[in-house]
């Protein structure tokens, strides 16, 4: 059994060895075949590459030869053209030489003719001098003088005619441009008044506004500087003040108090302060709306705010913001007709009265104040010059400045636009407040009762009771010396001391 197992194992081993050797031999034979085929393929590809390279060299040689032939042909054509040009130039040169010779002969003939003519002319001049008794120079002077006088007369007449025609045409064109601008600027306008009316829900509200012993109405008048007129007008209170900003603050505060229902001095003070903040926001919105209407962008925010303040400023009864918008539209329309810078004309027209937004706070003419503001907020030199020249204080040096000046005059001269008496009244009230504010220790002052009373709030830490009496007397004396007014003016100096503490 064991022997059979050993014999079987030896036989299996021999068979496996034989099969392995057969596989190895087969693999070696296959490898040799593959190598042989690879060599044959490489040799074939090598021959193909050599043939392709030879073909490419042959093709390139043919291409070079073809280009060389073309260049030789081109050079031959150029040589033929050059030869033709040389022949043409030679023929032209010969022709020119013949013409030069002919011209030379003609010049000699002309020169001989000139000499003969000059000789004849000299003989004629000598004969004329002998007959007239005048030398050539004297005759020339007489002739030149006569011609000069005639030319001067004709020139003067021509200049006069041209000037008249130019003036007539300029006036006609100016009328057309102004008419066009006015037609395209239809401004609705109502003259500003110095009173505002606040409607009441009922007449009982009048008593609450007046308050116990008049403390509410007195507090409201003191805080706003506005006259409250409570009369027989049903369900209405009239606010009177020459300053539209103060009047608007009082109107907003009073309407809020009426809506709230709680009316007492502390609440009045709170509502007045709230109305001031609300009006500041409204002023900025008005300025932004004005720039949007005109189509002007890039204005400094402070200039936008000052534009909004112009809505609450009047000039001879004309609202200054509406007037500025009107001037901007008119100047822009005329600039478009003349073909100059429309944006500069509009911008200058909108800002030309910007100084009026601060002229009641800062001393000086509104033109100078406007120029300073425009320089401060970096407006262009063209706009600054137009502001400076719009009242004729400075000669306009640009077309835009002249257009702003014309538009300002058109807007102001429009029938019904301004009222002289109202402006004089407002200036008188402003002068009263200016006199009061000029004294040291004065915090603020209000001209009320149509200028018949001035209320002055003083700083209690600087003005005591005795000084308040003397201050009233000094202000009265200054008013009497510097102003003319009908009737009498009541001067009231108010000194208020508050002590505030908090229980904790």
From Swiss-Prot:
The keyword Mitochondrion does not apply. One of its GO terms (molecular function) is RNA binding. Pfam families: HD, KH_1, RNase_Y_N. Keywords: Endonuclease, Hydrolase, Nuclease, RNA-binding. GO terms for biological process: mRNA catabolic process. The keyword RNA-binding applies. GO terms for cellular component: plasma membrane. Residues 194-279 form the KH domain. Its EC number is 3.1.-.-. Residues 320-413 form the HD domain. Belongs to the RNase Y family. Endoribonuclease that initiates mRNA decay. This is Ribonuclease Y. It comes from Moorella thermoacetica (strain ATCC 39073 / JCM 9320). The lineage of its organism: Bacteria, Bacillati, Bacillota, Clostridia, Moorellales.
